[in-house]
């Protein structure tokens, strides 16, 4: 009976050690991926586009929260990778970065005429209130 308990405790300890090492490996891989993404030459444009999307979704183009986020992201990029230009990038990451700039959210800022067409075809329904009246859709009378 004691032998089975000892075996079970040994097996349980081994499982915990394996799980711990797997978690550490996953965290290391995640950190490597974050470093590769943030050192990519198009990373600054990715941040800029993301912040533009946040501006549209919030409806407040001069939001201090968004500006603080922009400052924080810029500082973290500078502090993490001061010499990022020498690092090689993968083709999958290159493809992602390039395709991101053709996303619907980017089109909102680059093509004002298609703003509503883009918003109507988002996979999720989004209620947006824009700052300027020319961007507000007419509401149905009840």
UniProtKB/Swiss-Prot annotation:
Induction: Down-regulated by the AS1 repressor complex including HDA6. One of its GO terms (cellular component) is nucleus. SMART domains: KNOX1. Residues 4-36 form a coiled coil. The keyword S-adenosyl-L-methionine does not apply. Pfam families: KNOX1. Keywords: Coiled coil, Cytoplasm, Nucleus, Transcription, Transcription regulation. The keyword NAD does not apply. GO terms for molecular function: DNA binding. This is Protein KNATM. It comes from Arabidopsis thaliana. The lineage of its organism: Eukaryota, Viridiplantae, Streptophyta, Embryophyta, Tracheophyta.
């Amino acid at each position: 009976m004691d032998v089975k308990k000892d075996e079970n405790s040994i097996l349980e300890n081994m499982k915990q050690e394996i799980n711990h090492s797997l978690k550490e490996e996953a965290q290391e891989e995640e950190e490597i991926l974050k470093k590769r993404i943030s050192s990519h030459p198009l990373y600054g444009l990715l941040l800029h586009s993301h912040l533009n999307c946040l501006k549209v979704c919030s409806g407040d183009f001069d939001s201090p929260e968004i500006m603080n986020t922009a400052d924080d992201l810029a500082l973290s990029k500078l502090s993490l990778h001061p010499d990022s230009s020498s690092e090689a990038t993968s083709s999958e990451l290159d493809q992602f970065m390039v395709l991101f700039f053709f996303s619907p959210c980017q089109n909102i800022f680059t093509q004002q005429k298609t703003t509503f067409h883009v918003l109507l075809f988002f996979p999720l329904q989004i209620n947006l209130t824009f700052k300027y009246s020319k961007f507000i859709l007419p509401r149905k009378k009840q």
